[in-house]
């Protein structure tokens, strides 16, 4: 199938199964956080996964290439991003296993059956409305700041849509870790696994990967840190493995 690119769009190679993704650099492009989340999340054979705030569909497409899950759905509120995601799915001939739904995370309980997903992933906006400078480009601002949804919205939605024993995987920023752990527990999502991501071995962490289980027992494993760069411009071997180079 021939997929036509619109003005400003480009095809980017995902280094996985020959998959490519349509993006518009002037709007928003996926970052390393999404790729790391796709490597951290686990989807078993036969399981159904949902990505909240999927953007251009990077996480469902990567998870389709990395796991044996049955079906992957991406939920995205921005019409332009959802359109790019749908066309990327068609370009990669994944329409039988990946679907994109345009809609609001806060209304996901009306879009999907409750307790219907085995796995939910999310790479939500990191910054609260009053934290940091809001990007003047609205698509970028929505992706980075809690303009259309909050951490509470994301975690509350995950609780509603996960089956009992279902898993929630999220990437976020360490400065909000205490708040994240409290909200997860409040919504019966027990933190089970955590990994801090450091840009360099001698720097502070700038990302945190978290796995929580709906209705799980209290016990969390802190995995060894993930170091992104061995030196400037040279990825750590683990990063190359996650990207699939």
Tell where the protein language model's regions lie, with residue ranges:
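A generic structural signal for alpha->beta connector loops
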Residues: 18, 46, 69, 95-97, ...
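General small-molecule cofactor/ligand-binding pocket signal
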Residues: 22, 99-101, 192-195
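Mobile active-site "lid"/loop adjacent to the S-adenosyl-L-methionine
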Residues: 124-153
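Conserved SAM/SAH cofactor-binding pocket of Class I
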Residues: 42-133, 156
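Class I SAM-dependent transferase core
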Residues: 2-45
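Residue-level signal for inorganic ion chemistry
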Residues: 37, 123, 154, 212
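SAM/dcSAM-binding transferase cores
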Residues: 204-245
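Conserved Class I SAM-dependent methyltransferase catalytic core
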Residues: 148-199, 203-205
């Amino acid at each position: 199938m021939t997929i036509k690119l619109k003005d400003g769009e480009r095809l980017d190679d995902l280094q996985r199964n020959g998959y490519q993704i349509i993006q518009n650099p002037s709007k928003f492009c996926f970052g390393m956080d999404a790729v790391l989340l796709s490597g951290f999340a686990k989807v078993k054979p036969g399981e159904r996964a949902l990505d909240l705030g999927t953007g251009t569909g990077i996480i469902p497409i990567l998870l389709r290439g990395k796991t044996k899950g049955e079906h992957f759905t991406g939920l995205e509120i921005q019409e332009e991003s959802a359109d790019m995601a749908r066309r990327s799915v068609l370009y990669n001939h994944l329409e039988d296993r990946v679907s994109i739904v345009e809609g609001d995370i806060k209304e996901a309980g009306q879009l999907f059956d409750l307790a219907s997903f085995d796995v939910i992933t999310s790479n939500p906006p990191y910054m609260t409305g009053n934290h940091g400078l809001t990007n003047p480009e609205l698509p970028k601002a929505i992706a980075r700041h809690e303009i259309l949804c909050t951490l509470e919205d994301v975690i509350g939605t995950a609780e509603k849509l996960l089956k009992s024993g279902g898993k929630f995987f999220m990437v976020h920023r360490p400065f909000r870790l205490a708040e994240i752990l409290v909200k997860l527990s409040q919504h019966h999502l027990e933190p089970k696994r955590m990994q801090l991501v450091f840009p360099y071995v001698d720097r502070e962490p700038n990302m945190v990967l978290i796995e929580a289980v709906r209705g799980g027992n209290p016990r969390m494993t802190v995995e060894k840190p993930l170091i992104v760069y061995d030196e400037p411009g040279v990825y750590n071997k683990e990063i190359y493995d996650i990207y699939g180079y």
